[in-house]
């Protein structure tokens, strides 16, 4: 995917390039409404296109949430999955300041969902896990040092 969109920063220009890059590995086939027999089956040589294409839009958009989502939305095929993954990844990389405020406000109001607190909770859990891992590692290092 990286090579397919190297130097491309326009999501519209990236759409045919990403489609061409994933096509040899795609289980669905060229006609999304008339899927091939192997569609969506686990394979060592094929891939479900959504995640690779979403990552492609994150690259093309340079991590910009709005551009990543617009690219994914306009890609077609499983656009809702591609756009939501691209937006989630770009948003996670950039943090709250990278998410368009107007989008966040509209989505929070329409879904009646607090979009900020779950992120704070997940960040807190990640910090707790990191601290516990660091403590376990320090215990391991001390035990190894005691052997030498």
Indicate residue ranges for each PLM-predicted region.
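Generic structural signal for short, solvent-exposed loop/turn connectors between secondary structure elements
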Residues: 1-2, 113, 148
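Catalytic phosphate/nucleotide-handling subdomain of diverse soluble enzymes
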Residues: 49, 53-133
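Bulky hydrophobic segments
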Residues: 130-148
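A glycine-rich phosphate-binding loop feature that marks nucleotide/adenosyl-phosphate handling sites
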Residues: 3-4, 89, 140-144
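Accessory "access/gating" subregions that flank catalytic or transport cores
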Residues: 1-76
